[in-house]
Every structure is written in C-alpha cells, then in structure tokens.
Amino acid sequence: MENRQKKKLLVLVREAIYRKHYSKRTEEAYIHWIKRYIFFHNKRHPLEMGNAEIEGFLTHLAIKKRVSASTQNQAFSALLFLYREVLNKPLEGPINSLRAKRPKRLPTVLTKEETFKIIQCMSGVHGLMAKLLYGSGLRLSECVEMRVKDIDFAQRQIIIRDAKGMQDRVTILPEGLVKPLQEHLERVKRLHQKDLKKGGGSVYLPFALGRKYPGAGRGWVWQYVFPSARLARGPRDGVLRRWYMSETTLQRAVHKAARLSGINKRVSCRTFRHSFATHLLQNGYDIRTVQELLGHKDVKTTMIYTHILNRGGLAVRSPIDML
C-alpha cells in the first residue's frame, strides 16, 4: 500500500486500466474525466470525496455543460472505475444526479447515388478506407485499427477484434474490394520490410501478448492494414514504432469529399456505416442479419434504421400529389 501511495493517482489509474486490458481510447477518456472531476472540486483528492461530490459533478455536466447522455455515462463509468479498481473504495448507495436527456435523433443516411458521388471524389488509401466503411459497415476506429490477420480473403470476410463491448464479430468483405485491398497490402508489406531492415517493424500488441511473445510484434500478420506515414513513440512503453493512421486524417478526407460532391448533408465517417445498414434493409435483408453485421447487442439499436425506411418521401405520399 505504501508503494501505491507513493505513485501519482493518474499513474495508478493507467496501471489499473492496463491490467483490465482496456483500449487506449478508453484509457484517455477515463483519465480525462477523472481530471475534470478533481479540478471541478478544487483539486481535492478523490479519497476525500464520495457520492455527494460525484452527484454534483455529473449534475454540473448535465445542466451547465449540457453534455449528451452517453458522455455523462462515460464520465460516470470513469469515476466508478476510479473508486472501485484504483482506490478500492466502492461507492455505497445510488448516485442521484440529474441525468442528461438522451436526444431522439435519426442518423444521417445517404442515398446510393450520394454515396457513389462522395466515394468518387476520393482516391488512394482514403478512397479505399471509405469504401470499406460503407461496404463492410465498419466504425471509424475499426477501420484504422484493422490488422492484416483480420482480413480473410478466402472467406470474403473481415473479423473485427474487440469491437464495442469487447466482443469479436464478422462482417462482409466486398468482392469489389478484394483486388484493391490485396494490392494495397503488397505496398504495406514493402514498407514493413523496409522497417525491418532498419531494425524496426514492431507494432503494438494488444493485452499481454507483447510480454508473452516478445517477437510477435514484428510479424507480418500483426501489422496494421492502414499504417501511419511516420513512426511515433508508444504512450505506454515509449518504443518507436509505426502505428495506424490517425482517425482525423480520414475524417478530413471524407469531409472534403462531401463538400466537393455538393451533398448538402452533414457527412462523417459514421454516415457510411448508417448508409450500409439502411441500404441492406432496403435490399431486403432481415433485421437480425444487419444486427450481426453491425455488432449491435440489442436489436432495438438496429431498429432505428427501419424508422428511417418508414419515414420521409419514399414511405408516405403527400396529399398535394393526390390533387
């Protein structure tokens, strides 16, 4: 316990997150909210605080900052983790904060023609990634973090590892992307071979694999499908290595393509995933199949796309057209 007290709180948080095998994304989110919580209460140590202070912070987020329900839930999860896993001080009783309202918004969906227009305005690696977002229904993070071993060309499928909810799932590999993807991987392989010759070529391995198999990170199958152009030091181990392409890079490319195409909708990388689901339903695929491809735990989440199909000009005939 003395050693734990000597360490800074955020170091202990990172170590606990690492032991739980949480993603780097979750780590940064939890650190962010724990910092916000401490600063909100004038830098008091969390051990000096409890339910009342958590309620005050979460209510502040809902009322003053007007965060979404999902953002407030993430902040709450971070604090629960802090008290339970780091401080060994589980919270007693309910947290009676004012909860943020979950807005009822329909996702932005492109028509098939609009999707084609935007993709036509993209080329190279970004164009290939956009086609995967739409053609396979990938989340942005799933696309950029994909590894060579996750693509099964023989079965025409992509295995999404540790997706949302820490579950694997399988989605389709479009026939039309097989050759472009194979050609792209040949270029990536040449880059990897150059890195190996320079004494590098190692990528970050998930969970404890790096310790169990020290040399595995240099293997071809573990390399990222869409590697970054530059080497960078790992935030956890400080090792200089090639990471995956930044999400921001692809986001900017999609936004630019949407502007060039003249589509007057708020288009993001997520829009391709929404369009993938909607177009499958339009083509007659059943809701359960779409649910599995998207990786939704609850079919109610997938049902939002049926609401899109049942609303708007294609589903209802305006009375003015009957005059």
State what each model feature region is:
Residues 1-323:
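Conserved catalytic core of the tyrosine transesterase superfamily
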